[in-house]
Amino acid sequence: MVRLREIPRTATFTWSPGSAAPFIATGTRAGAVDADFSNETFLELWNLDLDNDKLGQELEPVAKISTESGFHDIAWAESEDHTRGVIAGALENGSLDLWDADKLLNGASDALISSASKHTGPIKALQFNPRHSNLLATGGGKGELFISDLNNVDQAFRLGSGAARVDDIECLDWNKKVPHILVTGSSAGFVTVWDVKTKKESLTLNNLGRKAVSAVAWDPEKPTKLITSIPLETDPLILVWDLRNSNAPERVLRGHESGVLSLSWCAQDPDLLLSCGKDNRTICWNPQTGNAYGEFPVVTNWTFQTRWNPHNPNMFATASFDGKIVVQTIQNTRQDASQAGNNQEQAVNDEDFFAKAQTRPQISTFSLPKAPKWLERPVTASFGFGGRVVSAGLSSGSRSSKITISHFDVDPNVGSATENFESSVKTGDFRGICESRIASSQCEEEKTDWKVIETLLSDNPRKQLVNYLGFSNEVDEAADSLSKLGLDKKEANGEGQLSPKSEGVKKHKRITSIFETNVEGESFLDEIASSKGAKTNNPFQIYTGSESEADRAITRALLLGQFEKALDVCLQEDRMSDAFMVAVCGGQKCIEKAQEAYFSKQSEGPSFVRLLASVVGKNLWDVVHNAGLANWKEAIAAICTFADDKEFPDLCEALGDRLEESYRSKKAKQARKDASFCYLASSKLEKVVSIWIQELKENEAYSIQNATDDTSFSIHVRALQSFIEKVTVFRHVSKFQDPERQKSSDWKLSSLYEKYLEYADVVASHGRLDVAEKYLDLLPASYPEAEVARSRIQFATKKPASKAATGRAPAPRHPPTAPTLTGTFQPAQIPTHKGPAPGSVNQFAPPALSKPTNPYAPTTTTSYTSAGGTTYTPTTGYQPPQPRQSNVIPPPQPLAPPPQSGPAGLAPPPRASSQSPSVAAPYTRATNIPAWNDLPEGFGRAATPRRSTPVTGSSVISSPFPNTPSLTQPGSHTSPPPSTMPAPRDSVPPPPPKGPAPPRMASPSTAGIPHGLQPAERPPSRTHVYSPPLAQQTSPGMAVPPPIPRGPSPYNAPPTVPPPTNRYAPAQVSQPTGQLHGQPPIAPPPHSSMPPPPGPYAPQPFQQAPAQSPYAPPPTGPQAPPPPVSQQGSRPSTAQSQKKAPPAQKYPPGDRSHIPANAQPIYEILSSDMQRVKARAPAAFKAQVNDTERRLNILFDHLNNEDLLQPSTIESMAELAHAIQVKDYETAQAIHLDILTNKTDECGNWMVGVKRLIGMSRATP
């Protein structure tokens, strides 16, 4: 707990009343001796000054006045006549003194209000009535108990008679619910309840055989419950009484080691009680249950008084005889604990331990298990995602809260508008949407946009656009007006005055005939052709003689079919009408030549000629770039009429760009509106969106300025809704496909994406999560601002990730072959065993030689290292067993019972194989021998025992020879994983680097198990690849893996750890004690304990015959160990083998909000199945089920923090979860084994939980 302030006084104290800044009044404790042996007594006021952040500092009094005697008790209460209240002191000389607190603070000399001496002895206790602050009760020697009225202190009346009691009243307390009830406690052990109204005793309690009472306290809420304490060293008890049964205490609180001197029951929370006493301790209790929450920092002397702050119970004060009153909080920041830990660690390493031990700060050893009652909210509410409001309130008549989840709309119109629009979109009624928006639009720009969008819905949108622009009837009207006009003969013949020839117009790149669709020209020629052979009455002459030379040249050219020469003559003579007539007969080339000549001549002519040239030359870009913007409608009409489909969008966009540039330069909104029309016609969403966003802001600002009762949020949401509706309908009409959804940056529609994201947030906050998800799907996958929104939507809707691995084939049921390691030693080859044969020698029978041989030792005599210090490198033909997690398959039992005597040895490991060995049937299904992490007995339905059928080439077979463990065929490449068999060893090698050796005793996991029923031990999750497993007690007929040092487990007790040995001390070799120096390689060992392994890196101190190394020849006798030698295959250095501290987790345990999408199926399926199992599991297996759930939570924490598990492992776990979900437990077990075999580094305690869940789920109906 945090020490806020310290008052350097040995004094009784009281808190200031009211909610103002807290003060403490102190009176020198009667009978206490100061450090300077002064006999002066003072009343002092202290300002705690909690606004100052200097914690634990000693204070100076702000007011001080001398008194005639020391204090036994002091009280401070509010008063109507005194601003800061009245302070009452119970003095040792029997005087009751009252002071004005305000005058004391101001330093006035008349601060003493009155001094009364009704008591004949010292006043031991006093207290103001909590309901009537003018009433003051005082108790003292000889059983004197007075009730005083501050309005007339001299007229105090006494309760009880003087002759009845001769003991002293040590404490008293007013009832907190019934103001006229008072309780007193005396030194003779009487606890008396008084009725002040009647001035009589109501009840007397026998305090546990009349033991002295040091403190009493009423329950702040229940008027019939009180607590008393005993100050005796022999009975340091706190008694809880219920007056409805006063014969015996309801509860006894035991925790103090010496007498209890003071009690303080928290007025704001009846579940908190403070006590202090002669054992220098202050303890916090729950008096309702009798449990002690813990104790506060211990001081060096008696703590004789403790008090909660009456207004702010977050802090309290405790006075002790070490000369300090400590003000501290009940909340702990843990800062002091860390500092104290550093100081303690420093003191341990220092020589002057006892010197520093006294200065070491005491720290709190507990935290409150629940929040105090004053921090509990009677009602609370919180807005949740998706338009939800979570509220909690107290149920009537109880402290239990009722949680309610309800829906909330910030603006109800948002939800209705969204629903109506989305329903119209689903039905495809886009024309109805446009019509309703046109009718409801309030600004002209909005209405124009919807009209254009409606026009685009027609079957011929380009024609409808021309009609919308007003060009549908203008041509007919112009033709009618011209027909009414009279034209002269020359104009009618097309021979009007032409402007001089100009060279301002260049030849167009692409020229086509303007007469290609001229119906009148075609009919004219048809009429001429049809007159062939007909008799006419209109004769003519080809040459009249009056024609010009040009006419003759034209005639001759026509007669010879030389239309091009005739055309040239016409053009030279400037006879354009004749030239066009000749060009019609001369073909396309002549027509183009005539057109070019015409346009060149008419470059300065009427504007329609320029337009006609653009149309004929299919060069509408000239109209787009050069036509005046005042005639943009005419330009867009020409584009709609003559442009081909490929150029149409680009032409409209270019015209819109010119209009928008005009808007930017002249700030003319009409130009922006016209540009919007062009962009809509061109279906250029990225261009029109920027204009619509500008209009959205302007319309929103205008609406806010003229709003009467709408909020700014509602206005903004309506404008945003209108924008989204226009974009959505326009996308449908134009069949827009966003080509940039796969890009990672530089999006053209980034402004639209922002609005989509904002709209999704708005509709999601109104509970329309499906609509929000729809618009979020329109954003690019790599849009960074959408990641949070997508994850919130997905979490709120509980949808699995899109990439859930459900369609993949199940994982193989056999792990791949472990890699073969190459070493420097070449062991002898193991003879190939293919079964018994007549006359064959049993190679596994115990040899007749007394001197054993090592099948894995080199064939030639080489130098060796001493036992216990052997270093080696694995060879090509054999890999040491790798550490594994679970699913260890022990070898089956031998066919014949083994002998109980004879030399012992361990079976050699199986040979390495280039193929993956098949997984045999689980051991627990083949036999009744439980493994360490199997389902508890009786959890599932009992399986019908049957004889398993061996699988060719994969199952483990028993040895046909007696007295031998079973082996697989070495040459079949189907041996089980190396970790299922123990390594060959005759000695006890050093344990893994971390952790000292276990004691000289049998492994806790195997002690007490009958022979042949030893379960396989779980190896540690991580160890070095060259660290050999430790030796283990073995049983006859079965090769059991050695014990592994491991952490606490719910299935066995942790081993006792002896002190570490000197890692560099030489081995202490002792003489053999009647046993051979070595053992046979195969013979079963006797049932005995192995000697304990040494500490890390220390040579083995032998207590029995020196055992040989599996990679060195056996010694012939006791040898002195050589000095340590560094070899290639030696154990890594200490620094390398030290286990690194686990990294700090990003998120607290239990948090599931950050599980990635690809891991969501794992969490959802496994947690759901765990709850199903938990609900149906038998009560006898509650502990196992809870442990499985705890281990699964470890997995979920890893997934939430995105650590430990690789993406491939998460994918495999998703397949496993899916297999559990569809009840394909065989596949789930195969995937589990595959992960366990190939990804050992990622497995931990959680993997055991997954295995158990598979079994429990299978057994649970």
UniProtKB/Swiss-Prot annotation:
Membrane spanning stretches: none
Compartmental location: Cytoplasmic vesicle, COPII-coated vesicle membrane; Endoplasmic reticulum membrane
Membrane topology: Peripheral membrane protein
Region (Disordered): 797-1156
Residues in WD repeats: 5-47, 66-109, 118-158, 164-204, 208-251, 255-295, 298-338, 382-406
Pfam families for this protein: SRA1 (PF07304), TPR_Sec16 (PF12931), WD40 (PF00400)
Leader sequence segment: none
Entry GO MF terms: structural molecule activity
Any one GO cellular component localisation term in the record: COPII vesicle coat
Keywords for the protein's UniProt record, in alphabetical order: Cytoplasmic vesicle, Endoplasmic reticulum, ER-Golgi transport, Membrane, Protein transport, Repeat, Transport, WD repeat
Compositionally skewed regions (Pro residues) per UniProt: 889-911, 975-1001, 1039-1061, 1081-1099, 1111-1125
Keyword Protein transport among UniProt keywords: yes
Residue ranges, compositional bias (Polar residues): 946-974
Main location: membrane
Skewed-composition ranges (Low complexity): 852-879, 912-922, 1100-1110, 1135-1148
Biological process according to GO: COPII-coated vesicle cargo loading; endoplasmic reticulum organization; protein transport
Function according to Swiss-Prot or TrEMBL: Component of the coat protein complex II (COPII) which promotes the formation of transport vesicles from the endoplasmic reticulum (ER). The coat has two main functions, the physical deformation of the endoplasmic reticulum membrane into vesicles and the selection of cargo molecules.
Complex and partners: The COPII coat is composed of at least 5 proteins: the SEC23/24 complex, the SEC13/31 complex, and the protein SAR1. SEC13 and SEC31 make a 2:2 tetramer that forms the edge element of the COPII outer coat. The tetramer self-assembles in multiple copies to form the complete polyhedral cage. Interacts (via WD 8) with SEC13.
Name listed for the protein in its UniProt record: Protein transport protein SEC31
Gene: SEC31
